[in-house]
Each structure stands twice: as C-alpha cells, then as structure tokens.
Amino acid sequence: MTILTQTCTPFEGQKPGTSGLRKKTRVYMQPGYVECFVQSTFNAIGGIAGKTLVIGGDGRYFNAEAIQTILRMASANGAALALVGQGGLLSTPAASNLIRQRGADGGLILSASHNPGGADEDFGLKYNISNGGPAPEAITDAIFEQTKSISSYKTLDTPDIDLGQIGTVALGDMAVEIVDPVEDYAALMEELFDFDALRELFASGFSMKFDAMHAVTGPYATTILENTLGAPAGTVMNGVPSVDFGKGHPDPNPIWAKPLVDLVMSDDGPDFAAASDGDGDRNMILGKGIYVTPSDSLAMLAANAHLAPGYERGIAGVARSMPTSGACDRVAEALAVECFETPTGWKFFGNLLDAGRVTLCGEESAGTGSDHVREKDGLWAVLLWLNILAVRKMSVKDMLQDHWQTYGRNYYSRHDYEAVDTAAANRLMADLTAKLDDLAGQTFGACTVASAD
C-alpha cells in the first residue's frame, strides 16, 4: 500500500464551533474538503503517529464515505489503531465512553447532532480529546489556524474496507477494530442503573414510548429497553437509523417530535415518553399529559439521582449553561453542593467534571449528562428518569408537582428562530448586548429584571 502526499488549497471558514465544524453536506462533499480539515486536526494535535483513535458517527448522509477517507488518512499519518463502530455507527456518548474505556488518544465524531441529514442538509465533524470530551478552545483554535495554511495531506491508495463485520482488519500499518457500537455503552448503563428494578417496572404494566427519530439511538434503545429490560416490542419508535432520518428533523422537542407529544397527551397515552436526537446526546422527557422542560429535568435529576446505584452516594455538584434556568441552583442549595454556570457548549463542563467538582450537567437545549462520560447523553437521562420512577412509584406529573412544592418553580421558555437572516440576527444580539448594563431593575409588564448577562 502506497502512502500518498496530496497537495491541497485551504478552504475558507473551516472554524470549529462549540460542537465541531458544521456545514451543509455539499460543502463537505467538495473534493479535498474533508481531507484538509482532518489533516489540519492531526497537525494541530501534534500528529497521530502510534496513537489510537475512535471513529464513528450518527449514520447521516455522507458518513460512510467520510469515515473511509478518515481511516485512510489516519493510517497514512501513522496511527496504530482505529476503533470504529460497526457500520460506522457510534452515538456521541457511546464514542465518548469508548475513548475512555479503551484509553484512546482521541476520536473523530461525524455528526451534525439534531440537524437534518441529506445531500442538501447538514453535516459535521469534531475532534474529542482523551478524556472523551469535545476539544477545548485551545485545540479548536489551533485546528482553525492549521486550516488557513494547509498545503498537503497524507492518505492511502486503497479501496474501502468493509465496516459491516465485527473484527479486526489491517489498513496499511494500522489496525482497524470494528466493534459492536452498543455493547460497551449498554454495559456502562447497567453499572449505573438498577436494571432489576427497571425490569419490574415494565413487568408491572408501566407503558412507555421512545422515539429514536430514525437516528443513531434506535439500536441502543432497542437493545437496552426492549431486549434487556423487557419493555414490549414496539416501545421504540422509528428505531432504524436512516441517512436522512426518515426525511425528518431529528430534534427532540415538541415541534419536531409532535407525533410523540400528541400520543402522550392523549387519553390512552403511555405513562412515560422520551425522544433523542441525531447523534444521541439530547433528550426530551414527557409524562402522561405533561412536558418536562430540559431545565426542570436537570433539576429533577439532581434532586433524585441518589436513587440510582451509580449515584447513591449523592452528587458532588451540578453545572448548567448560562441560558438554562436556575431550577437546579435551588436543588444544589438545598443539597449543600456546588452549582456552576458556564458558557454555552458542553466542552465548558469538562474541567469541572474532570476535577470532580460536579456530577450532573445540563443545558436548556435538551442536553443532560453526568461524569460517566464527557458528552451529554440522551438515553442515559431517559434511564435515570426510569430508575427514579421505579423507586418513587409516582407519575411524572406528580413528581413534578412534588418537586415544585419542595424547591419552588422557575418558569422558563425557550424560543427557536430558524433560518433567520444572519445579519439581522447579529444586529439583534448586538442591540441586546449593548443594553445589558441597563436592563437590571427595569420592569416589563408584571416582571422586573433581576440581572442580565
């Protein structure tokens, strides 16, 4: 096999955001686009000679082709081992877990999260570091600098390899280990939660629906909920991953998951319902007749996490992004543990998790997670909710009412404005920012602004 050094010209705008480089799929499909960004990433981290990488994605359109490109480049750049999910599939939290369990040096995750998939939709690629979390700004800034001057990349002149069979194959001097994408993650969940109690919950007649939204969590949810815990067949809806997410929008909110919401709000709806997004890191929680906001969900989980075996000693602390409501702050105060507010972006929780300062983290954008991995984790949140329900033997609605009686209620609303003009949006944000210093103390209707930042 011949290592090729190909010349290339930098592409403008390859600046990673809070979750990697997100672009339209056709942008990524340009000749050399993936190669320039991946080589820039390898260069920015000091090369990958002798290293182990985890590679996988959410199965969206162009994932398969991009993974083959990355594997050839990893081999040409001297990597010793690539761990790849069977079929190229790995949920983002499962990839984080695999990096940590196998002691990998990092990973490349191919996903645009909750954004739609397809040739004319969205694509993404991000680098995670050895703790399993998203690359911090120092690394993403270094990657961006490399993209400005990249002039060549290394690859192999080889055909694609078969990622459909579990096992190890050689690609040049690099070993490619194709792993079951669900197995290690499911084992971790069984360590954290009382699976016997969950089996009893389902055996009692407790009803549930989980909408995988034709995305990557389908196989994970089917294996854990139906095959392991005994939930009835059909509990998992839209459970087969598709390159265009069934021509849907894999964002677990009341708009894009409306069929699930309508079902749980109906007279004969299930006791509990949940959904996850494209790459499996977000979640939506519902009970019969009620929707749980992500901010309230984080607070509820913080107050009740000790009921699950993995958290029976209590939580060290809790962290939330700045736009997330202060509901979890009230719980932290009552538990006498630390509470942190961070900028938006899961990577800002990493130092707190690594230092053992916090156990749970959450965002109002439907991301919740804990120190078990370094990414938010949709199915983990669902299983923790189930564990709490199994122990407390209350409905979701009754649990929320009890929580609000105990800690008070933070009224909170998120509004999404999609496909708006960028210039107009920037003007709006600039105007709001300019007014921040003067907003505190102002009254709007019946409400007075306490603080603004």
Where are these regions (language model features)?
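N-terminal small/polar loop signature for handling phosphorylated ligands or for N-terminal nucleophile
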Residues: 43, 54, 58-121, 223-285
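Buried hydrophobic positions in well-ordered alpha/beta secondary-structure cores of metabolic enzymes
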Residues: 19, 55, 95, 108, ...
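Phosphate-binding and adjacent anionic-ligand microenvironments
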Residues: 270-272, 285-287, 312-453
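An N-terminal, well-structured beta->alpha segment
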Residues: 1-76, 171-208, 228
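Proline/glycine-rich low-complexity loops and linkers
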Residues: 87, 137-182, 287-364, 368-369
